[in-house]
Design a protein with these regions (language model features):
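A structural signal for multi-pass alpha-helical bundles of membrane permease subunits
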Residues: 1-195
Length: 195
């Protein structure tokens, strides 16, 4: 889901940043409007759609609603707008078209932005609770967050198991952050100097 979001966001953001087409501002405003709508508002329609497609209790049902993110499109668009025009002019002189420029120049320069976006999306998707609880019916399909919640049953609370589960649940987020920390710092410092 994270890889797909980064790819879709990159392609959409590049179109919004570099191309002129009818209703561009209106469409981008609609993309931004999706970031203002809480996920809980559309959960019923998402569930009915997933149910009608026969994707409940499947990995596709878990992943499909989170394939496109307005926040990711916005972040990548802002990055593409900040790229100096000289890069595109030099690539055009060297014979690159739009796709060549995107894949050979803009995307390699965007690695810190990709890393920051991927870490943000990983934490957001990995920590989902309500959607996986709603879509899955078998324990084998449920996420670790739901498993930890199921450790609390009635009057019995086994704190040792809950804390062990919490430690296991937090490890992937910590590892992703540690591995991507250099890229996050590069991304933050890249926007600090204008010139």
């Amino acid at each position: 889901a994270i890889f797909a979001q980064v790819i879709f966001a990159t392609l959409a953001a590049y179109a919004f940043a570099c191309f002129e087409f009818p209703f561009k501002k209106l469409l981008f405003s609609l993309v931004l409007a999706t970031t203002m709508v809480p996920g809980e508002v559309v959960v019923v329609t998402n569930y009915l759609t997933i149910q009608n497609m026969g994707l409940t209790n499947s990995y596709a049902g878990l992943v499909l609603p989170s394939l496109i993110s307005g926040t990711a499109i916005f972040l990548m668009r802002q990055y593409f707008l900040a790229l100096p025009k000289e890069y595109k002019e030099a690539a055009t002189i060297d014979g690159c078209g739009e796709i060549g420029y995107l894949f050979r120049v803009a995307m390699p320069l965007a690695v810190p932005t990709f890393a920051s976006l991927a870490i943000y999306l990983f934490v957001q998707i990995y920590n989902q609770f309500f959607w996986p609880l709603l879509v899955t019916h078998e324990n084998a399909m449920r996420t670790i967050q739901i498993g930890i919640a199921f450790l609390v049953t009635g009057d019995v609370i086994s704190f040792g198991q809950i804390l062990a589960g919490a430690m296991i649940a937090i490890l992937p987020s910590v590892l992703v952050y540690i591995l991507g920390q250099d890229y996050i710092i590069q991304g933050m410092t890249a926007g600090g100097i204008k010139g």
